[in-house]
């Protein structure tokens, strides 16, 4: 399996701005979508990890080997009932975002559902597409998500969707070179499913 999926992050044509109605659509992901979705995640992690994750670790955790491992892991999660959604740019039918939620396996989970990933390429940000992706993935479910403690953009995004900081201490992700994480929680939502 070729895991060296390239994702073009160049600017889109001026005649079709990100805010054009219907430019970005959310759909259920299938197994065949996972390589491109994992590549999107790698691009986004490289972006948010700059200056936060040590360079050698960042190169390792966003390289082809990890992308391949992510694809394998996501295939298992999908088979086990995880919810996968992708965001597609209708200009060229590329995947520009991915979201995955699953029933948490953590013993200290504050809610049944965990948002395990939500990443959107820069050209699809700030136009409502990320909001649509999150809504399609978890709807009104109570959920939690771990974010980099200093990722103000992600924290603001989740707070706009009713998430708040967990009162428990954050965590440190040693696999990312000791990055500090913060958990955000959305509770007391009427479950839609």
Spans of features found by a protein language model:
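Conserved G/P- and acidic residue-centered "switch" motifs that form tight phosphate/ATP-binding loops
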Residues: 128
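Terminal substrate-recognition subdomain of acyl/acetyltransferases
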Residues: 2-19, 177-193
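Conserved active-site alpha-helix within GNAT-family acetyltransferase domains
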Residues: 131, 150-178
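Short hydrophobic clusters on alpha-helical segments that form packing/core surfaces
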Residues: 136-137, 154
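Acetyl-CoA-dependent GNAT
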Residues: 6-7, 12-13, 24, 28-34, ...
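Conserved GNAT acetyl-CoA-binding A-motif
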Residues: 139-150
């Amino acid at each position: 399996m070729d895991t060296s999926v390239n994702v073009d992050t160049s600017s889109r044509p001026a005649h079709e701005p990100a805010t054009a109605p219907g430019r970005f659509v959310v759909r259920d992901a299938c197994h065949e979508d996972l390589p491109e979705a994992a590549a999107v995640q790698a691009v986004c992690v490289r972006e948010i990890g700059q200056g936060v994750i040590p360079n050698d670790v960042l190169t390792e955790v966003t390289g082809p080997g990890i992308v391949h491992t992510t694809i394998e892991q996501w295939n298992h999660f999908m088979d086990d009932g995880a919810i996968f959604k992708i965001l597609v740019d209708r200009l060229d039918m590329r995947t520009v975002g991915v979201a995955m939620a699953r029933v948490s396996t953590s013993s200290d989970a504050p809610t049944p559902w965990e948002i395990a990933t939500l990443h959107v390429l820069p050209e699809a940000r700030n136009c409502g597409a990320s909001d649509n992706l999150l809504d399609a993935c978890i709807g009104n479910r109570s959920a939690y998500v771990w974010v980099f403690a200093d990722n103000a953009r992600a924290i603001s995004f989740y707070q706009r969707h009713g998430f708040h900081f967990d009162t428990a201490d954050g965590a440190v992700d040693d696999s990312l070179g000791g990055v500090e994480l913060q958990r955000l929680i959305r509770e007391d939502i009427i479950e839609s499913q």
